[in-house]
Amino acid sequence: MDLCQKNETDLENAENNEIQFTEETEPTYTCPDGKSEKNHVYCLLDVSDITLEQDEKAKEFIIGTGWEEAVQGWGRTSPAACIWPRKIPKKARVGEGACSDCLVCVNLSHWSLQTKPPTEGGPEKDQSSPSQTQAAPQGPSTASRAISDICFPTYFRAEKKSLQIKEFIWCNKDWAIPGTNRGKASGNPSGGAHRGLSIPGPLTSRALLVLPPLKASLSNALDVLGKKSKNSFLQSEEKVLDVEKDGCVAYAYGLKTADGKGEKRASELAKHPMVNDTPSSPSPAAQISLLTDPEQRCLHWSLLSEKNLACPPDPSNVRYLAALQLLQKRGVQSYKSKFKAKEPRSPVITRKHVLPKAKQENRPQMLETKVFPRPVLPSLTVSRVIIPVSTHRIL
């Protein structure tokens, strides 16, 4: 038994020695003097004090608006909470403030309580007067009422709505029957809530003078538009008819001066339907301007055939036409006789002389057939043919 106990004690001692040996081998950071730890703590405290002083100095130069706290979420108040859109607050209780979140409203409430004297006036002043007179016994309730009045003042919204509706209905009645409504408005006694809403008589007369009724204005506007469209259409038709009538008058005038057949053609012009429908006659200035210049009045007679002539020519032009017709007949005959007389005199006919003669014979026919359906311009064709062609070369 003793041996067993001795072995156990030896084992326990050995274990204790091993533990002590490991503890001795671990590095110890203890200093001989404890001043270093204290100095370190003091340094940290000094740094914190310096930072606090710097922060306080910075806050002194910056006006505190509360925006930093509102953005970072450190505070529960904002400088202009009443400006932001939010729900309409409920009625404040006796011990609660209606706008406790708004710093501006709190400052205004304190200032209003100090400066405003108790006065009696309208319904708003009647409500604020008992809160100011009973400021000593009921401190929190008066402050809350003043704050609520500043942030969200009560404007008697029911009366405001009734004012708008009453004005609207009254205006409609005035437009329909102005005389009866004026009598009703002057005769009906107004209530206490609507004493300031009674409308005088001159205002209604001014409104009626300035603003016409809507139905009449719409009908007048439509009539004016219809008249404008009709006038524009009639003016365009009159212009067309005047131009046609001017042309026809010029044509009739030319017929009478040109030939004796003008009477027959003038009767045909009288049957024209458009001239008979015209209500107004053309101005004399337009007739003079059309009849003075014969070139402007109609195209040149030599460029068109007799059937297609729009206006007859002057007497001088008629004489010239007759002369040209005579020249045409005589010129062709003389040309043929001269050409036949010259043919036997030519001793030798070469190919060079035959080709231009054949061309000369074919030229007037081509001009007459292709360019002019009838020989209206013989002078142009004959002038090229009548020139005698010498068969012998001149040395």
Swiss-Prot record:
Biased composition (Low complexity): 128-141
GO CC field: cytosol; nucleoplasm
Region Disordered, residue ranges: 115-144
One Pfam assignment: DUF4529
Highest taxon, organism lineage: Eukaryota
InterPro entries per the UniProt record, alphabetical: DUF4529 (IPR027836)
UniProt protein name: Uncharacterized protein C16orf46
Organism: Homo sapiens (Human)
Species classification: Eukaryota, Metazoa, Chordata, Craniata, Vertebrata
